[in-house]
Every structure is written in C-alpha cells, then in structure tokens.
C-alpha cells in the first residue's frame, strides 16, 4: 500500500508543479479559471501555512521537550503582536520592536514555567484547564485594552508593494509572457518560515544543544 500511496502523492505533486510553472495550454483556463487566480490561491495557502508553522513550531518544541500543554501559546503570540504594534508606533521602528517583544514574551514564558507548569508537572489535564483559563484572561484583557478593531504594522519600504516571481501567470496574444506579482511582505514571511524551519532542524540535529533537547524528549 505504501508504494502506491507514495506514487499517488508524487504524481499529484508533479501535476501541481506543472500547473504552477508551465504555461497553460488553450482551453485549460476555461476549466480551472484564470491561472493568475489559481496561483494567488496556491501562494496564499503556502503563506498561511508558513504563518501557522511559525506559531506551531514553538508549541510543538515546548510540548515535545517539557511535556507542557500550554494552550495559552496563541494568546502569548497575540500579546506579542499588540506589543510589537505599540513599540513600533512609539519608536517608529518595526525592526526595534522584534528584540524588545522577544524579550518581554520570553520573560512571561519563564514566569509561566516557574509559577504554573513547574507546580503541575506531568498533570496534563490540570495544565490544559489552567492554560485555557490563562488564555481567556489574557484575551479579555487585550480586548479591554486594545478593543476589537484591527491594528496594522506597516511594512518597510523595501517590503511594500508587489514583487515579481518568475512564475508565468499568463501569455498575452502578442506572445508576451506575464509573470506573477505577489506581495513582497508575504514572500518574506515564507522565507522567514523556511529559514526558521531549517534553523530548527540544524539546531536539533547538528549541535550539542540539540542533542540535549532530543535526549530530553526521549527521556
């Protein structure tokens, strides 16, 4: 069964790659719609997956190493987003907000570890219930302070606007090839997720710290 499913997955991946990179023959757009819309949907899904990976990577690493069921993880990310907005508005630099927010949220995580998780080591149900409560309290406090409206941290000039990706989106009647244009900030998000994923892989498999982490997971 496994070779059959592997072959099916390989063929499906080949078809998707062909649909993305190859010029579509006449008549295919009548079946699937415009290729530009198809490509935007594909890249939008990849971008969303990259964002989910950034959020989930920390949760899985913490749970895998320390067996902490931290369901307040998402609220901590949300708090980091709000703090990043406030700091970038105050300082005028979105780049400065990154290390400051990192330190603040990391300190909050250390406090949770020492004051909450250490007292409930190995008690998954209690950790689940307590962290759900912490998540609800944090979410309500943020809703009270920042309200329900959305906030935007504007991208720097070098990430604003669309960027051209070497993927053919259409071919005009004159034979001119039109390449896909996609928001540069979303491309940066995909590369950031890829970089973090590769960095975590190398950290866990090629360094002494990674050896300690893997040993902690196994034992």
Where are these regions (language model features)?
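Small-residue-rich transmembrane alpha-helical segments that form helix-helix packing/gating elements
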Residues: 1-66, 71-216
């Amino acid at each position: 069964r496994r070779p059959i499913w592997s072959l099916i997955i390989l063929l499906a991946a080949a078809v998707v790659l062909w649909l993305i990179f190859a010029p579509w023959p006449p008549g295919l757009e009548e079946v699937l719609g415009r290729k530009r819309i198809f490509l935007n949907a594909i890249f939008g899904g990849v971008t969303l997956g990259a964002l989910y990976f950034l959020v989930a990577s920390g949760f899985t690493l913490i749970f895998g190493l320390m067996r902490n069921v931290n369901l307040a993880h998402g609220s901590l990310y949300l708090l980091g987003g709000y703090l990043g907005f406030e700091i970038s508005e105050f300082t005028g630099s979105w780049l400065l907000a990154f290390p400051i927010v990192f330190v603040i949220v990391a300190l909050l995580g250390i406090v949770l570890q020492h004051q909450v998780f250490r007292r409930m080591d190995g008690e998954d149900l209690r950790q689940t219930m307590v962290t759900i409560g912490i998540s609800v309290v944090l979410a309500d406090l943020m809703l009270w302070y920042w309200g329900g409206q959305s906030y935007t941290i504007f991208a720097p000039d070098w990430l604003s606007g669309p960027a051209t990706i070497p993927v053919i989106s259409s071919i005009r009647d004159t034979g001119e090839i039109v390449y896909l244009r996609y928001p540069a900030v979303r491309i940066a998000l995909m590369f950031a997720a890829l970089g973090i994923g590769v960095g975590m892989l190398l950290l866990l498999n090629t360094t002494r710290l990674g050896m300690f982490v893997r040993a902690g997971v196994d034992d």
